[in-house]
């Protein structure tokens, strides 16, 4: 049996900040239970999927795997990041102590069908799609964005991650985790303008500077994965 451990409690800045205990506890329990059960039942291989938020807030960009645990985390999603780092370390520990073929991959920001569009808990891309769609439908004159719009983010279609996950199951057996990204970045404001144009919204974009920006830049270094022979194919 092969286990793809993609289950997690996830959300944007608002949810991460508001439910800090839940984000830490729920994610620790999910990964600990599944990883331990996989060991007990003797699964052939397990892939644990983490997140790019594991990296320190001021880590050099693009983010390389060796930057893990070299500095302080972004405060807004620290509980989630700590849980994901624990998942990586669990896989490494079970490999070291029991010889389990448990591997870890850290995907960048994902988007795609069946995303979470709840404004209280969604990530930035689905949140913006919903905001612009509803503003157009209701004739609202402006869409308010959190922060300045200057942070840079990388996005990957979920189908690309599925493809990369299968590739890693077949070709990757190392103890250390590996980045999975698209290699392309865009500012949040540019993303908003793109969505505004696609939706056909004619109103204005305004900024709520009282709300946090999050990490200034988050781009993955995909060198290791590219060298193995995989790269993303779906552009934003």
Protein language model regions, located:
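Glycine-rich "substrate-gating" loop/helix at the edge of Rossmann-like oxidoreductase active sites
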Residues: 76-80, 108-123, 147-159, 182-184
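Conserved beta-loop-beta element that borders a ligand/cofactor-binding pocket
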Residues: 50-51, 88-116, 126-129, 137-144
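NAD(P)H-binding glycine-rich loop region in Rossmannoid oxidoreductase-like domains
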Residues: 1-27, 40
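Conserved catalytic Lys-bearing alpha helix of Rossmann-like short-chain dehydrogenase/reductases
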Residues: 28-34, 43, 83-91, 125
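Conserved catalytic-core motifs of eukaryotic protein kinase domains, centered on the activation segment
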Residues: 13-21, 57-62, 114-117
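Conserved Rossmann-fold NAD(P)-dependent oxidoreductase catalytic core, especially the SDR/UDP-sugar
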Residues: 5, 32-77, 103
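Active-site helix of classical SDR
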Residues: 69, 79, 83-86
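C-terminal substrate-binding subdomain of Rossmann-fold SDR/epimerase-dehydratase oxidoreductases
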Residues: 134-236
């Amino acid at each position: 049996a092969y286990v793809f451990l993609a289950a997690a409690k996830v959300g944007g800045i608002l949810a991460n900040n508001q439910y800090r205990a839940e984000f830490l506890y729920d994610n620790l329990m999910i990964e600990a239970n599944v990883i331990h059960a996989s060991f007990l039942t003797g699964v052939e291989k397990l892939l644990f999927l983490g997140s790019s938020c594991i990296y320190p807030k001021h880590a050099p960009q693009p983010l390389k795997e060796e930057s893990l645990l070299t500095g302080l985390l972004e405060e807004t999603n620290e509980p989630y990041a700590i849980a994901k780092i624990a998942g990586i370390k669990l896989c490494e520990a079970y490999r070291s102590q029991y010889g389990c073929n448990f591997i870890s991959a850290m995907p960048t920001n994902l988007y795609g069908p069946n995303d979470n569009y709840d404004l209280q808990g969604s990530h930035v891309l689905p949140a913006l799609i919903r905001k612009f769609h509803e503003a157009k439908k209701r004739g609202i004159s402006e869409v308010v964005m959190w922060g300045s719009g200057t942070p840079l983010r990388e996005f990957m279609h979920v189908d690309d991650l599925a493809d990369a996950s299968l590739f890693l199951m077949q070709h990757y057996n190392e103890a250390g985790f590996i980045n999975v990204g698209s290699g392309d970045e865009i500012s949040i404001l540019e993303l908003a303008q793109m969505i505004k144009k696609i939706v056909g919204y004619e109103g204005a974009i305004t900024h709520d500077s009282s709300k946090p920006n999050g990490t200034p830049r988050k781009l993955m270094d995909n060198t290791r994965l590219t060298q193995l022979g995989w790269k993303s194919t779906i552009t934003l």
